[in-house]
Amino acid sequence: MENSQYCQLRKQYIEQQFCRLNHMQRQAVYCINGALLILAGAGSGKTSVLINRISNMVRFGDSYNSDWFPKVDGEYITALESAVKNDEKLDFETEKEISTGAIKPWNILAITFTNKAAAELRQRLSDSLGDTALDVTASTFHSLCMRILRREGEILGYGKAFTVYDTDDQKRVMKEIIKDFGIDEKFVRIKTIMNKISGYKDKLISPAEAEKHANNTLEGIVVKCYGEYQR
């Protein structure tokens, strides 16, 4: 079999695996190299594209766009021909042999906002990839960052047993701080202080650095509370 014939046959097989997607969805799934932005409305199949794109990365890599011809035994080519002819799915090992540039699942991160969405991602990846899906990191932003901090937090001065505060916890602590400092909540609202502290943190400005640039009474109060809050 000639190189071009083989590549066309492989492309046909890959197209069969994603035939339920529409044309634009398939173009996104086949895009492996570089960044890709998908803009679509609710219920348009963005999650399906994400799941299938990851599946394509793990199973076929860049095979759809490649003209690479692997040195495989005739039995694999025969199996590929049969799968295309009968619209069947090859076993994992055969797909691995005919593919090029497949991405290791542990090098893939699928991230979303809610626990529900992350659970759906994991379940649908499992349905598509089986046990291989367990090696794909699919999580929320918060759980991923928590995992990183648990593992690397000592570099930042955090122990492994730190606790993450939610909004109510933050307000409770700040209320205690301004009470200890004798600050009247009628003069400066807790929400104002928290928002300004959040702004400092977003810009990676420490309490000591913020203090250097406090130009008025309000900023002075915020910086004072910021330093205590960090403790």
PLM segments and residue spans:
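Walker A/P-loop
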Residues: 33-53
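N-terminal pre-P-loop "Q-motif" helix
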Residues: 17-34
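Small-residue (primarily alanine) positions within well-ordered alpha-helices
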Residues: 28, 40-42, 110, 117-118
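A basic/glycine-biased coupling hinge at the interface between accessory DNA-binding modules
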Residues: 2-11, 15, 33-35, 55-231
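Acidic active-site catalytic centers that drive phospho-/nucleotidyl reactions
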Residues: 25, 46, 140
